[in-house]
Amino acid sequence: MRVLGIETSCDETAAAIVERDDMGEGRILSNVVLSQIAEHEPYGGVVPEIAARAHAEALDRLVDRALNDAGLKLYEVDAVAATAGPGLIGGLIVGLMTAKALAMAAQKPFYAVNHLEGHALTARLTDGLPFPYLLLLVSGGHTQMVLVRGIGDYERLGTTIDDALGEAFDKTAKLLGLPYPGGPAVERMALQGDQKRFALPRPLKGEARLDFSFSGLKTAVRQTATELVPLTDQDVTDICASFQAAVADTLSDRVGRSLERFKTEFPDCATPSLVVAGGVAANKTLRAALENLCTRHGFAFIAPPLNLCTDNAAMIAWAGAERAATQAPDSLDIAPRSRWPLDEKSAPVFGTGRRGAKA
């Protein structure tokens, strides 16, 4: 089965074609991604209206390129899949409407894919990973620990109660006057800094719950920087190094508890695995910390290639292909969802916002 996938949930416009054979093995036939970094850089973050307009301007030619790169015509694909949520509603509308139109014109089945499910299943495309396994999703919009039991069978073990990790990186970079996107900028500066200079907090470290929290760490960075104004270059590099070390330590504690939970629930699993996905997974320091953690706990550490860790359409096409193997197509009446939990059975997680408790 060959599936055309479309991804427009945030600030990457993407189209791809993936093939899934009868044995469940996958192959990427094409994977085209157009980043909007240049459009959003002047604002220091993603502007939803600009993102939606950029998707609308670029998506048709990206679909054409994906088909050309795969050597296929539209009628030769077997299904069309698109991200239906979660994400920025304007971008989701652009991708979903385009995918529905293509599916209707070519008379092909249509699959509405949860963006998080795309990340959750990528390791099955790249590594043929069997169920069950653990997924750590760390991106600008999400920080979650998910138990993946099967297609559509997910349990959220932990999530952030305030800020996503990628957001904490971006806000730290902006505070320190570093360029957008913030994650790579902080990582570059941290290479030259002293991670022991500032004693930044490790939120929730030592607690039995498996959730994450990064707002307190972000606040500590702001307070530290404010006390040092005017900042020297060395101050900036040391803050970045201390921030990154605190994140690595926090992740190791939170994820380590999830690894123990997995071994308790699946004591007979021959090859327990931790999959790391999302843009923050590109950070070499964090990857090294998690890889060492997996080695100590007897887990395989799996991180898909960088171009498949960040937002892309190959993961959406693959998730559509996995669903097509076992499920009926979705209706063309399906609507985009800006919020769409991967595990809808889980109770809401309550954190603290400016106006008090929030879900």
From Swiss-Prot:
Residues 328-359 are annotated as: Disordered. Substrate binds at residues 137-141, 170, 183, 283. Coiled coil: none annotated. Signal peptide: none annotated. InterPro entries: ATPase_NBD, Gcp-like_dom, KAE1/TsaD, TsaD. The keyword Cytoplasm applies. Disulfide bonds: none annotated. It is found in: Cytoplasm. This is tRNA N6-adenosine threonylcarbamoyltransferase. It comes from Brucella ovis (strain ATCC 25840 / 63/290 / NCTC 10512). The gene is tsaD.
